Design a protein with these regions (language model features):
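C-terminal motif of bacterial Sec signal peptides marking the signal peptidase cleavage site
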Residues: 4-7
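Secreted/processed peptides and extracellular or luminal domains of membrane proteins
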Residues: 14, 44-46, 107-109, 146, ...
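Tryptophan-anchored aromatic micro-motifs
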Residues: 19-47
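Residues that flank catalytic or metal-binding motifs in active/ligand-binding sites
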Residues: 23, 51, 69, 157-159
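Predominantly extracellular/secreted and cell-surface proteins with exposed
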Residues: 33, 41-132
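Edge beta-strand at a domain terminus
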Residues: 128-170
Length: 170
C-alpha cells in the first residue's frame, strides 16, 4: 500500500534511477512537518523527514528521481521556481460481501525554488504536500481512524523542505 511516507516514498537507492537531462546533483533534504489534517503520526509522518533526491533538468522540465521512479515537473520562466505533481490511486481494501472497497487517491505536490537558474544548483527550498481523498463510491470507514491510518478523509499534510547538494561539484 503506497500511502505511508516511509514506505512508498522510500528514497533509499537514488543512484539507480535513470537521469534525463543535465544533472543538477544529489541532495540531502530535510523536511519539517508544517501542518497536517490527517492526525498525529498518520501514515508514518514524523515531525522531521530526512531523505535524498537526485535532480536533473532539461529545458523547462525538472526531474525528481527518488530511487523508485522519475517524477517530472516544470520550471518557471525565472529558471528557478519549480512545481511537480503526481497522483496515485491506492486500494486499501477490496470490495466484498455487499460492501464497496476502499480506494484512496493520493496527490503529491512539490513546489520550490532552486538556488541557481543554471546547472550549478547548490540548494533548494520548497514544500512537499500530500493530499488524500476517498475515491467516489469507496467506503473507507473501517480504515479511517485505525492504527497508522488517517483520522479523517479528505486530509492533507505538508512538509517544508530544505535541500543541500551533497557534493559541491555535482
Amino acid at each position: 500500500m503506497c500511502l505511508a511516507l516511509s514506505g512508498c516514498l522510500d528514497f533509499g537507492k537514488v543512484d539507480d534511477a535513470k537521469a534525463p537531462g543535465d544533472l543538477l546533483g544529489m541532495y540531502q533534504v530535510t523536511g519539517k512537518l508544517a501542518n497536517s489534517s490527517c492526525g498525529d503520526a498518520a501514515l508514518g509522518a514524523g515531525a522531521i523527514w530526512n531523505f535524498q533526491v537526485k535532480l536533473t533538468r532539461f529545458d523547462s522540465n525538472i526531474y525528481w528521481l527518488n530511487g523508485q521512479e522519475t517524477l517530472s515537473g516544470e520550471i518557471a520562466n525565472d529558471g528557478r521556481t519549480f512545481s511537480i505533481q503526481s497522483d496515485v490511486q491506492v486500494t486499501i481494501s477490496e470490495p466484498g460481501r455487499g460492501r464497496p472497497g476502499c480506494v484512496v487517491m493520493r496527490r503529491d505536490d512539490a513546489e520550490g525554488k532552486l538556488s541557481d537558474s543554471g546547472d550549478d544548483v547548490e540548494s533548494f527550498e520548497g514544500t512537499l504536500s500530500f493530499s488524500y481523498a476517498a475515491v467516489s463510491g469507496s467506503d473507507c470507514s473501517d480504515w479511517v481512524g485505525s492504527q497508522g491510518a488517517v483520522d479523517s478523509l479528505p486530509c492533507s499534510l505538508r512538509y517544508d523542505l530544505d535541500g543541500k547538494r551533497m557534493d559541491p561539484k555535482k
